[in-house]
Each structure stands twice: as structure tokens, then as C-alpha cells.
């Protein structure tokens, strides 16, 4: 059943009662999870990402980084994937922020400092496009850990069935 809910009023009431930032996303329960996830990522960055200027007194934690968008347990079944991705980029001298898997709202607020965003699930594409439009942050669609998931086999001339997550495939 589909019911009408005043999400804006609900958001205001919850925020006032809890003194916390609240984000509501209009979903009807009739679409797949990735549509709700897509709406949530977009709403999150629309509401909380701010333009930040890099300054000399910033610590390394706040300096430009690589944003990883689309990391959720629903899309990336390996719960250690975020840490593995952070290590991949750390080994290249970069800091990776995995929005949605371990990195919090402060990182979303600093999204404008990302040198680049990496989209690791289809649900994150609209958010990356929004951040590109708002801050000029380029993005790429990739999964940094794909090589560890795919066995080394000659796939030339073969047909492959992709089940579930298209970016990882």
C-alpha cells in the first residue's frame, strides 16, 4: 500500500525534537533498493555538502582526497571493502573517503575538497554528477577492488552473465 507522508514536516519535527540534522527521502516501497539509495545519496550531498576552501592551516585529514560514492553493504558484500579501498589509495599516497561505509557527515560536508570521486555502484552516479556540477569535481565509474574479485581466466570470445552489481562486474 502507498500512503501519503509529509516528509518535510516529519524532518522538521524530528530535527526540532532531537536537535540533530535529519534527512528524509521520499520512497514508496514499490521500487528496488537502489532507487531509494540513489535518492538518499543525492539528498545527502544536496543538503550537507558545502563549498570549502583549502587553506594552509588545514590538517592532513581535511586536505583533498578521493571520494568513494556507493559503498554500502547492500552493493558491496565484503564488509572489509572500504578499508581495502582506503589502503589501495593510501598506497598511492592518497586518502580515500568512503561515503556510506565508515566515513561520517563531516566528510560529506567536506565533499568539495575531493580531487575526484569514484562511483562504485549505479545508485551513486546521480550524486557524483551533482557534485561535478556544484563543485566541478570530476568522477569516474570504477571499482578499485575488481581485480581481486575476478579470477584470472581468458575471457576472450566468452559470454558473461552479470548478476547484481554492474560496476563491480
Map each language-model feature to its residues:
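An N-terminal assembly and electron-transfer interface module characteristic of large anaerobic redox
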Residues: 1-169
Amino acid at each position: 500500500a502507498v500512503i501519503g507522508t509529509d516528509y518535510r514536516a516529519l524532518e522538521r519535527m524530528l530535527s526540532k525534537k532531537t536537535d540533530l540534522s535529519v534527512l528524509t527521502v521520499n520512497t514508496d516501497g514499490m521500487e528496488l533498493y537502489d532507487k531509494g539509495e540513489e535518492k538518499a545519496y543525492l539528498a545527502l550531498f544536496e543538503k550537507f555538502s558545502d563549498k570549502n576552501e583549502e587553506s594552509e592551516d588545514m590538517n592532513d585529514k581535511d586536505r583533498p582526497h578521493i571520494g568513494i560514492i556507493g559503498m554500502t553493504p547492500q552493493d558491496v558484500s565484503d564488509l572489509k571493502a572500504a578499508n581495502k579501498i582506503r589502503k589501495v589509495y593510501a598506497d598511492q599516497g592518497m586518502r580515500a573517503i568512503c561515503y556510506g561505509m565508515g566515513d561520517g557527515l563531516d566528510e560529506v560536508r567536506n565533499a568539495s575538497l575531493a580531487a575526484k570521486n569514484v562511483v562504485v555502484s549505479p545508485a551513486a552516479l546521480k550524486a557524483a554528477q551533482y557534485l561535478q556540477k556544484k563543485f566541478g569535481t570530476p568522477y569516474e565509474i570504477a571499482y578499485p577492488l575488481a581485480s581481486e574479485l575476478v579470477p584470472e581466466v581468458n575471457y576472450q570470445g566468452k559470454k558473461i552473465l552479470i548478476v547484481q552489481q554492474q560496476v563491480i562486474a
